[in-house]
């Protein structure tokens, strides 16, 4: 009988991440090209008819496509896939920088997290991936000086793209608490800045 402690969860994680990425690319392409106009349309909400919620990304990408004379659907597909692959790559690095136990692997690859896309392909290609990418950027770079400059701008941009970001802000504070095991506000400067800019932006769009 194979014991759990003898299983290399990092190698299993690499294989799973590979198939998750392939699955995401395949279904995103199908949805964007022919099968689900709603998912593509959500990314392309813009300010053509006036200021609306979730329009920042769409306004940006529509203008880029217009200026560079690019196919809007293909450009959107390329950018969303790039966002997801960067997330997968950083998650891969995070996994290999930590000791992966059975419990951690189970949490990462449970049907409620990354494997949810296999159970419900219609969840693929959603804007929520922006939160996951920003959060993993935060895990890697929150102690870097450049992140303190970029974080407010990114938090505002993501909130203007999907207001759900504001409701996920507690994850940043929970992570900091788990790191320092303290409620000293001086240690939460990055999290407070992210929350402040996101919340102000949220108040502006509601």
PLM-predicted stretches and their roles:
Residues 21-34, 55, 187-206:
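Membrane-lumen/periplasm interface segments of specific transmembrane helices
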Residues 25-41, 48-60, 162:
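Extracytoplasmic catalytic/substrate-binding loops of multi-pass membrane glycan-assembly enzymes
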Residues 48-82:
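Short hydrophobic/aromatic helix or loop-helix immediately within or flanking a transmembrane segment
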Residues 55, 103-133:
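Aromatic- and kink-enriched transmembrane "portal" helix at the membrane-lumen/periplasm boundary
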Residues 78-100, 137:
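Transmembrane-helix motifs of polytopic, lipid-linked glycan transferases
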Residues 135-148, 182-183:
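Membrane-interface transmembrane helices that cradle and orient dolichyl/undecaprenyl
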Residues 147-172:
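Membrane-interface alpha helices of multi-pass inner-membrane proteins
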Residues 169-197:
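Perimembrane helix-loop-helix junctions
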